[in-house]
Regions:
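Sec-exported extracytoplasmic/periplasmic mature domains
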Residues: 8, 22, 41-44, 59-63, ...
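Periplasmic-binding protein-like
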Residues: 1-7, 70, 74-117, 136-149
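Flexible hinge/capping segments at coil-to-helix
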Residues: 5-23
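Paired acidic/hydrophobic, glycine-rich loop segments that form the ligand-binding mouth/hinge
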Residues: 25, 64-69, 85-86
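Ligand-binding clefts/hinges and TM-proximal coupling segments of bilobed small-molecule sensing domains
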Residues: 31-48, 87, 117-149
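Short, well-ordered beta-strand segments
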Residues: 4, 23-26, 66, 100
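Short helix-initiation/N-cap motifs at beta->coil->alpha
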Residues: 10-12, 46-60, 95
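Short helices/loops that flank or line small-molecule/ion binding pockets
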Residues: 15-16, 38-39, 52-71, 79
């Protein structure tokens, strides 16, 4: 998870964001909302219907930062550099990607997909797909400083 901080905001840790004087926007009910609520309970958290509305609050100066996943924060700030700076608060707090399957007695399909994912992660395919897709929107691996894919 990252924060897009307003220009001039020089915070580096989750503890620094966990301050009653810091205003954070999130999209309500999202994983960003859960992380900000858990790691920054002292901060003023503003919840919006969408991530776009949370970004608009940042652009308007109504909040100091927006909590959002890295892939989105990099894309958003690449498209609109005036939005703010991407901050990867420490300690790094990451999320997993998940897929849901209908519960079935026969677990063959689920096990096949899990095996396929692990095999392709081991080959570096998942990483290369992420890097190539981010390059399509102008983001290089160098832009993902501090994060190992």
């Amino acid at each position: 998870f990252t924060m897009i901080g307003r220009k001039g905001l020089d915070l580096k840790t989750w503890e620094q964001f966990n301050d009653p004087n810091i205003r954070i926007s999130v999209d309500a009910g999202s994983s960003q909302d859960q992380v900000a609520t858990r790691l920054c309970p002292k901060a003023q958290i503003s919840r919006f219907k969408t991530a776009d509305e949370a970004a608009a609050a940042l652009m308007a100066g109504r909040v100091d930062a927006q909590c959002i996943v890295m892939m989105l924060s990099l894309t958003m700030t690449k498209k609109n550099p005036n939005l703010g700076n991407v901050i990867i608060p420490t300690p790094v707090f990451a999320t997993t990607s998940n897929a849901g399957f209908r519960r079935e007695a026969d677990k063959t399909w689920r096990d096949y997909v899990n095996t396929w994912i692990e095999f392709n992660k081991g080959l570096g395919l998942i990483r290369s797909v992420i890097v190539k897709n981010m390059e399509l929107v102008g983001i290089s691996e160098a832009d993902m400083a501090g994060i190992t894919l």
